[in-house]
Amino acid sequence: MARASSSSGPLPPLANVPSSWAQPVGAGEERDEGRRGGLGLLAAVSVPCPDFSRQPWAPASASGPMPFALQRLRATLLRLHREREQLLRARDCARHLQAVVRLLRSGSSAGSLSLQQLHGDLQLCPSRGAALRLGFPGSRETLLLTRPVGLAAQHLEAAIEMQLRSLGRTPASLGLTSQLAELLLALPFYHTLQGHSLNFVPGAARPFPAARVLQLLAAERGCQVADKLAEARGGSGLQEQLRRQCEQERELLPGLLGLVGGVASTDSSGLRLGGPGALWSQYWTLLWAACAKCLDLRVGPWEDPRAMAQELSQALCQAPLPQECEKELLSLCHSLFHQSVICSWDQGFCQALGSALGGQSSPASLSPTSELLQRLFPPLLDSLRQPRPELRLCPPAGPTPVALGLCTLQTTLLWFVGRAQQHLAAWDPGSFLLLLQKDLPPLLSAVEALSSLASEAALTLEVEQQLGLEIHNLTEKMQLLPKESLGLFVQECHKQATQGFKLHMPRGRYWRLRLCPEPPSDPSEYARIVVYSVLEPVLQGLQGLPPEAQAPALGQALTATLGAWLDHILTHGIRFSLQGALQLKQDFGVVREVLEQEQWGLSQELRQTLLSLSIFQQLDGALLCLLQQPLPKNPVHRRPPRCCLCYEVQTTELPTSSLNSLENLAPPLRLGVSPAQNTHLLSTLGGGGRGGGGGGGPGPSPEAYLVGNQQAWLALRLHQHPRWHLPFFSCLRTSPEP
C-alpha cells in the first residue's frame, strides 16, 4: 500500500478556508455531486477528510467570502482525492489476490513461491477494522472486498491439503522430509490469512493443526501400504510385505514426527498431541487404521472376505509387528469375518424363505427348507466362537451375530409350526411325522448350540444381552415342540377317527342280533375303513425310521384311534347283544391285523410293545363288560319245544357289581350243539387277549381289565327280559334278542 501511494505522489492539501465559505454551498454541491456520481460519490462523502493541521499550500491571508467557482473546484478536488485513495487500496487488494491465485495455479509445492513474498502478500489483506477505515459505510461494499479473501483462504486450504496428501503418497525418502518441511513452514502464513478470513466469512477455511496434518499423512501412507499388501496376497508374500512396510515406516517416522512436533509446538490453537511417545503411538494407530480401511474397501463382492481374513490372521501370527499394527489388523480380520458371515447368512436366508413356499420331505432325505435353515447356523456359531477385539475405532457394519441368530431361530420356529399345522390340517400324517422325526432333531441341536454360545459369549452391549435372553427363551420354547407337536398329532388322530366312526359305524339292530351258532369270523366293513384311513398314513410316514422313533408316534396314534372308538360307543349309547359283542371283538381285531402286515416292516418287539398299551386292556375290559349278558330275575325252566327249532340256554347268574368273576366266565351252552362247537365258543370268549384279536396265552389279571367307566359299559348290555310269555305256545314267545 505504501509503495502504491508513493509511486503516484500525494496531492497538495487544500487551504483551510472559513466555514462560512463552504457550508451552505458545499453541502448543496455535495448533494448535487452525489446525485450525479451515484454510488461512488456516496462512498466518497463518507471518507474522512485529510488532516488539516498540516501547512496549507495556499496563502492563509485570504479573507472574505470564497467565490462560488472556487467552492465548486474545492469540492471536486476533495472528491477526486477520495476516489484516488480508494483506487490505490483496491489496487493493493488486487495484487494480493493475484499472489494467491499464482499460488493456487502453481500446482506444485508451496515452496514454488518465495516465503517472504507470500508473507508480504498475506499482510496486505485488510482486517475488518481496516476495511471500515477505508470509508465503506455499508455491508455491500465490505463484502465486495472480503468475499474474495474468504474464497482465497478456502482455495489455499484445499491446495495445502492436496499437497499433504501428495506427500503422503510419495515413497519414503529424504526428499519427502525436505518437501514436507517446506510445506509446514508455510502453515503459519496460511493461519494468518485464515484468521483474517474468519472475520468476514466464518467457517470459510479450517486451520491445519498438528493432529490434522498427521491424520492426512497417515491416511495416504496407509492406503499405499494397503495396496502393497493386497498385491502380496497368497503364500508367504503377505508376511514379508508386512515386515518390510513396518521397517520403512520406522525409518521415516523420526524425521516426520519431528517436523509435525515442531508445528504442534508453534501452533497454540491446534490440538496438542503430547510427547514423542504419544506422537509415535498415534501415528501408528492412524496408519494401520487407514490401511485396514483400504483393505476392507478392496474386498468387493467378487472376493471372499473370509479367505482374506484367514490370510491376514496367519501373517499376524508369524510376523513380529508393532502392537498398533496387530490391533488394527486383528480388528480388520474380525470385520472381514463378520462381513462373510452376513453375506453367507443373507444368501442362505433368502434361499430358505424361497424354499419355505414348497419343498416336501422325502423318506430318504430332509426337506430342502430344513437343510437350508440348518446351513444358517454353522457360520453364526463360528462367529460367536471368535474372540472379539477389545477396542475398535469403528465396529463392523451390519447386524451382530446374536441378532442374526435370533432372526434365524424365529424363522425356524415359525416355519416348523406353520408346516406342522399345514400337514395336520390336510391330514397328511406321513409328512408331519417326517417333519417331526427327521427335520426337527437336527434343527433342535443347532438351536441349543446357538443358545449355549450366546449365553457364554461376552455380550457387552445391553441390546446384545437382551437378544441373548430372547434366544434363550425361544430355545426353551422349541425344546417343547416334540411334545406339543405329538399332542397336536394325537388330537388330530382322535378327530379323524371320531369323524370316521360317526360317518361309517352302524347303530341299532346291527349290534342287537340274536346269538348265532357260529361266532362272527370277519370284521365289519366300517372297522376296516376307519382304522385303515387313520393308521395306514401313519405307518407310511414311519417307514424307514428306527423302532425307537416309530414307537412314540404309533403308540399315540393307536391310543387316539381306539380311544375315539370307545368314546363314540359310549357317547351314542350303542347297545350290544352277545352276538353284537362278539362282532365288536372281531372289529377290534382289525387293529392287530394292520400292525401285523409285513409291508410296514414293524419288528416283533415293537408289535409286542404296542399291543401292551393300556388302551388294549381298556378294549378287553369293555368287551368283558359287554359279554356278561344278564338273564331274567326269575328264570322259567321248560321242556324243549317240539313244534319248532328253539333253544333254551342254560346260564348261571353272575354278579354285576364286579368283573372279577369274568375269568371263570363260561359260555352259554346250547342244546343241540356239539361239544366241539361249545368248546370253540368257550375259547373264543375266554381268549379275550390283547387287541381284541383273540391271541393265545394267559391274559392279565382281572384288575387290569377294570375300566374307570365300568358301569357305563355294563349299561350298554342288552337285558334279556321278555315282554310276554305264552307257556302253551313257546314258539310265539318274544325273542330275548329282537
Curated annotation (Swiss-Prot):
Keywords: Coiled coil. Residues 685-698 have a biased composition (Gly residues). Residues 1-34, 682-704 are annotated as: Disordered. The keyword Coiled coil applies. Residues 69-92 form a coiled coil. It holds the Pfam family CC142_N. It comes from the Eukaryota. This is Coiled-coil domain-containing protein 142. The gene is Ccdc142.
